[in-house]
Swiss-Prot record:
The protein's name: Unknown protein from spot 258 of 2D-PAGE of etiolated coleoptile
Note: On the 2D-gel the determined pI of this unknown protein is: 5.9, its MW is: 34.6 kDa.
Source domain of life: Eukaryota
């Protein structure tokens, strides 16, 4: 949740 656009792909990957 750092990039903003990515959402939570930087902190943790939900998928």
């Amino acid at each position: 949740a750092y990039g903003g656009d990515g959402g939570a792909y930087y902190e943790w990957s939900p998928a």
